[in-house]
Regions:
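Phosphate-binding/catalytic loop of phosphoryl-transfer enzymes
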Residues: 1-74, 78-83, 175-181
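ATP-binding/phosphotransfer module of carbohydrate and carboxylate kinases, centering on a glycine-rich
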Residues: 20-25, 67-181
Length: 181
């Protein structure tokens, strides 16, 4: 019996890439998962990007506030500690803004087509997260002269099921000739 190990966010991204996120096939997107932690699954030109040492997607530990609060990883001002801190205080708008700033870094670095949001925390207030992240990306697009064409932000379809669907694809895709699982 084959065994495959991968990050939940990579599994979700794979599920979205091959499982029918409308317009995702062959495109580049970030799946941002906000739950008890914060991670990302990255799809570049239709394939999950894991990095040379499988470390791609450690989204929650990018530093965005140099003198910020201490994170459990040992850094200060990580997106995860700032975002989850706001969630813990009931400040959903602030959590969405912080998530948007970090998403803007991804958009600027990778020039992705769409940002998809998921996870239990996002499920609790999906409109607030889509709106908050979208506002930050819209401001970024205006500053960069993109003519107001911000990268779209949506809630990933199929909720928590997408992780399980992607995990199944990790095993099944190679059996059906899809080598980029």
């Amino acid at each position: 019996m084959p065994v495959v190990v991968d990050k939940d966010t990579n599994a979700a991204a794979l599920g979205l890439a091959v499982g029918g996120e409308e317009g995702a096939a062959g495109r580049s997107f970030a799946y941002l998962h906000l739950g008890t932690g914060l991670g990302a699954g990255l799809v570049i030109d239709g394939s999950v990007h894991r990095g040379a040492r499988t470390g791609a997607g450690e989204f929650g530990h990018q530093v965005i506030q140099l003198d910020g609060p201490l994170c459990e990883c040992g850094n200060r001002g990580c997106v995860e500690v700032l975002c989850l801190g706001a969630v813990g205080r009931g400040e959903v708008a602030e959590a969405a803004r912080v998530l948007g700033v970090a998403a803007g870094n991804l958009v600027g670095l990778l020039d992705i087509d769409v940002v998809l949001l998921g996870g239990r925390t996002v499920s609790g207030a999906p409109e607030a997260y889509v709106s908050g992240v979208g506002e930050v990306l819209g401001a970024l697009a205006r500053r960069e002269g993109a003519g107001g064409d911000a990268v779209p932000v949506r809630v990933a379809p199929r909720g928590e099921r997408i992780v399980a669907e992607g995990a199944a694809q990790l095993l099944l895709a190679p059996l059906f000739g899809r080598g980029d699982a």
